[in-house]
């Protein structure tokens, strides 16, 4: 009995050791042939999960797996052979019927004979402890075909115990988590952790950016240390943040099922795996199991010059308001990204002056080394003969979706050279600031070019001797928003003269809340309350805005409220409107304002009944569950009724994240002499000036001057028409996302989203002494096209989903002031044109031989035009300003 017990324990001990030896990964039995059924399928849709509404394809086959060699030093060192046989390609959507692109075609016709032969050649997999040590295949096989074999081979890499580790497979070097439970193992691959060389870029701005999500789960059913069934599912979903109808999803599945086992070839003996492989076939070579990049053959693709000729007519100046112009702009950018410098230069040099600005927009927006070299060779900054082209180039740089260090380095080099136009020199510095901001947002603050640009901006601001240079560096800092620049801004805000002081405060206004420290707020309070010196109204009101928009304290709010009633007349009304707007629109400061208003000393009739024409109002353009867009308009007048500043802002929100889409600020000063009026306190010695400062998609652009100085004003009044001055005009690449994906199945996927717009912002200021009336106009006209393109490619069959949306919108702001009486009459109008919105969806499946299936859908709606509401006082005033002419009661001569 004791002897039996000892023998039993020895048996258990040896059995346990054997199991332990096999728990690290799959283990094949000697001299057995495993016959399996394998399929990989992929389908694309807009995220609705309806298979009948999707496009895609399925590749299926039989698979033979045998163990060729096992190391005599350990069971977990194995060499296995995997052979794909009996390949089929068919629709994933079985309801396609007669429309199936595979109908009547055999695998050699679909895949091509040479590709099919390569696909069915065996591969060898060297596994140690369940992990891939080497992957062996034949050289010179098409990468796309090798990737399909890699996708199958990667399924055999797994471990039988729970835990988290890193594995290298077709997806790259990835973090994976195993969950083992009895005869089932689940492998979760963190796709965002995978290290693999793939091209791609994205727009870092959260509002204009794309949200993508990827998951990969593989479930193994294990029996006798080998797979009975494997099911892998990989999902990639994408959506545009502010327009969620631009969305798509790729679902890729792999299924592997054991059908039977039968007698197989005997194990090969030997200690070195290299000798075994050579004995099997000396042509085998070790290649990476990580998926390799391949380019599909492009049949009938046009050259750059051919494509340019096909889209050129749509980019003529008269056609820029049409959506076809923006679509042509986007497609041309895609062609430019694969073009060489010489090809691009050839087109630039051959074009006429009318179409060159649009061509410069496109070449700059391509953002490739070749396109940058071409445009820099083409433009001559030492000449003043092509200023429009230089400015269009610089604006396109400022709006760049994914700028690199080389672009910034090029602009720094240009700035240190000579210029034919001082306006262009200013624009270069302003755009340098914008690029610094974008590169820092992309974790590039320590790049040498960024460090050099910071020194250039801050050093230039500190040493500037001319007013124009100070303004230029302040505008650059307004774009860059460098924390280290705040002490300089505080110095200029408090001590400098009016325009510089105002620009310094508006620059501080652009900083995020964490940078508006107690020290900053103390300075803003001193400016607003004029404790050290007298400041212009524009400076004081902007300082108040900085305080109120950045977590104001109880005493800060109370002191601002108590000041109302002690300010100049129009400033009283303006500050009162600001407070009322905060309360009505429930801005962050509204809770603190309500707390303070519980005190009677702050909340009384005298304070809240101040008259005047200045105003502030915020409202919604559109409001949805995920996003919203708002407009705000505040206008400050001088005591004599002349416009001092109008500020129009449009913000786009995704959740609580804002994008400052548009800001148009019109400023005027020193015009009181025209109507023999008395200037306000602190503004007695201001030169006559009017200008417009634009900000577009978070990028401050160079301000435009209407007139500067009394003589310039008089000449403009006597000679100028009411034609508006163009402030910003051009084509902008606003959204730019490109992602190349290596699917676990071996297929290649691409997800791209592009958004472009044609924009035209113009402004005018009309002044009539005869009618004692002034008019200010700001016109915004935009045409927007957004395209999403998702494809899955095997090199012999391709499925794709294209979604696009387009719209045209116009917004006009008119301020009319009649100062023939006092109080003067003011009417503000904000009108929006009717907005057509169109959405298109195209789904397709296409063989490399040309046969295809296409499905198209279209949706169109019209949003009626409207006049945006402003405060009630404005509505009443407009009725007086535009009162109908009284009808004559007499029909005779007298």
UniProtKB/Swiss-Prot annotation:
Organism field: Sus scrofa
Name of the protein: Microsomal triglyceride transfer protein large subunit
Signal peptide: 1-18
PROSITE patterns, per database record: VITELLOGENIN (PS51211)
Keyword Phosphoprotein carried by entry: no
GO annotation (BP), single: lipoprotein metabolic process
Enzymatic reactions: a 1,2-diacyl-sn-glycero-3-phosphocholine(in) = a 1,2-diacyl-sn-glycero-3-phosphocholine(out); a 1,2-diacyl-sn-glycero-3-phosphoethanolamine(in) = a 1,2-diacyl-sn-glycero-3-phosphoethanolamine(out); a cholesterol ester(in) = a cholesterol ester(out); a triacyl-sn-glycerol(in) = a triacyl-sn-glycerol(out)
SUPFAM superfamilies for this protein: Lipovitellin-phosvitin complex, beta-sheet shell regions, Lipovitellin-phosvitin complex, superhelical domain
InterPro entries noted in UniProt: Lipid_transp_b-sht_shell, Lipovitellin_superhlx_dom, MTP_lip-bd, MTTP, Vitellinogen_b-sht_N, Vitellogenin_N
Record-annotated Vitellogenin domain positions: 28-662
Keyword vocabulary terms for this entry: Disulfide bond, Endoplasmic reticulum, Golgi apparatus, Lipid transport, Lipid-binding, Signal, Transport
Pfam families membership: MTP_lip_bd, Vitellogenin_N
Subunit structure: Heterodimer; heterodimerizes with the protein disulfide isomerase (P4HB/PDI). Interacts with APOB. Interacts with PRAP1.
Compartmental location: Endoplasmic reticulum; Golgi apparatus
